[in-house]
Amino acid sequence: MADVVIVRKCRHGQVRVLFGDVVDVEGDVMVIPANSRLAGREGLDERMQQAAGPGLREHCAGIARKKRTSNLQPCSVGEAVSTPAFDLPASNLVHVVGPDCRRPTQDTFRRELLRNSYEALFEELGGLEPRETLVLPPLGMDVFAYPHREGARMTMEIILAWMDAKEDPGVRMVLIVTHEDNFLNNMKTVYRECEDQF
């Protein structure tokens, strides 16, 4: 069971930060922090693909094969692709490739790439039903090594701006779920320091 740490009311619903295991949190749409091959080979991506069962790996392999026939990556940095959820507690999954800060070229442009990743997620969500509850781990964290303080601030800024925007995203509850103490502490600190700005 995930513990609720932060709750923020927005124009179109609510944003909550939870401490726990994302694979146990139910929602309409769940986000997987993917790599560009959609292979689920490391970190949270691997754990979530394992929890979804072999059907998801086969489905992602099919997407990869199809994209490679056109000489394209299955899902590039700053892109998103949706799939069925298989054994995860959601109706659909959105695989989003965030910046990998272990790579110098991506680290240099990490802020822009992270923003692009969230924008790709929001665009992909627009075509999914149901989507009232969105479950997501913070993008770019985990093995992709995005700096936690900066990542916490950007995650809050981007998601709250989206949920407070004039256009209704069709999402009523955003559940940001992390199991990393350091990221959670940074989220709490950033929220306390900037609550009036958010």
Segment roles from a protein language model:
Residues 1-198:
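Macrodomain-like recognition of ADP-ribose-binding/processing modules
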